[in-house]
From Swiss-Prot:
Name of the protein described by the UniProt record: Cell division topological specificity factor
Gene expressing this chain: minE
Function: Prevents the cell division inhibition by proteins MinC and MinD at internal division sites while permitting inhibition at polar sites. This ensures cell division at the proper site by restricting the formation of a division septum at the midpoint of the long axis of the cell.
Protein family (similarity comment): Belongs to the MinE family.
GO biological process, one term: regulation of division septum assembly
Keyword list, A-Z: Cell cycle, Cell division
NCBIfam families named among the record's database cross-references: minE, PRK00296.1, PRK13989.1
Species the sequence originates in: Pseudomonas fluorescens (strain ATCC BAA-477 / NRRL B-23932 / Pf-5)
Length: 84
């Protein structure tokens, strides 16, 4: 091993680390473009469970949406209740 090999080896980047870095960039980009947070499906499921304690509804009867307007976030909840 000569002196030049020593300096070249430190600059070598493994393909795994390059792939990992690229994947992290892609994931961050995808998360930034998503309009709904990760917790909305779980929130919708829990809301359906709570409402079912009092009213007979299906999981399709509850719609949850999150809307961003400037610096405010608005959580919209639409529940279709059955006729009495």
């Amino acid at each position: 091993m000569n002196l030049f090999d020593f300096f070249r080896a430190s600059k070598k980047v493994s393909t795994a680390s390059v792939a990992k870095e690229r994947l992290q960039i892609i994931v961050a980009h995808e998360r930034g473009q998503r309009s709904t947070p990760d917790y909305l499906p779980a929130l919708q499921k829990e809301l359906v469970e709570v409402i079912r304690k009092y009213v007979n509804i299906g999981s399709d009867d509850v719609h949850v949406a999150l809307e961003n307007q400037g610096s405010c976030s608005i959580l919209e909840l639409n529940i279709t209740l059955p006729d009495r």
